[in-house]
Amino acid sequence: MIQSFTRLAVADNSGAKELMCIKVLGGSKRRYASLGDIIVCSVKKALPNGKIKKGQVVKAVVVRTKKEVQRANGSLIRFDENAAVILDNKKEPVGTRIFGPVGREVRYANFMKIVSLAPEVL
């Protein structure tokens, strides 16, 4: 459950380390984002030699949330941190590697490139 001003870790090697959610995309009254949702973020911490710089405004897809997500079969999935993967204008990941597991809901949201790069899909 990601909303405005939520801080997220970055799960790729784009150069950014921490993001802050500015807006949840998908309607003017939409308040929360979950796994597989696209959000607009500001980069709060970044590596000095990375592709993404501090202060940049980027779009990202949520791949891990601390708030549990209920699946269709009744099971719940939750992670230890909130994390996102930074996207370019074509909704492809900016980084070439993904760190940590990603939720299966990312696959249902048609982010196949992220799913194929991820070491584990839960």
From Swiss-Prot:
GO cellular component: cytosolic large ribosomal subunit
Any GO BP annotation: translation
UniProt superkingdom: Bacteria
CDD domains named among the record's database cross-references: Ribosomal_uL14
InterPro entries recorded: Ribosomal_uL14, Ribosomal_uL14_bac-type, Ribosomal_uL14_CS, Ribosomal_uL14_sf
Record's keyword terms, sorted: Ribonucleoprotein, Ribosomal protein, RNA-binding, rRNA-binding
One Pfam family this sequence matches: Ribosomal_L14
Alphabetized GO MF terms: large ribosomal subunit rRNA binding; structural constituent of ribosome
Known partners and oligomeric status: Part of the 50S ribosomal subunit. Forms a cluster with proteins L3 and L19. In the 70S ribosome, L14 and L19 interact and together make contacts with the 16S rRNA in bridges B5 and B8.
Record family assignment: Belongs to the universal ribosomal protein uL14 family.
Function: Binds to 23S rRNA. Forms part of two intersubunit bridges in the 70S ribosome.
Name the UniProt record assigns to this protein: Large ribosomal subunit protein uL14
Species whose genome carries this gene: Campylobacter fetus subsp. fetus (strain 82-40)
Gene, per the UniProt record: rplN
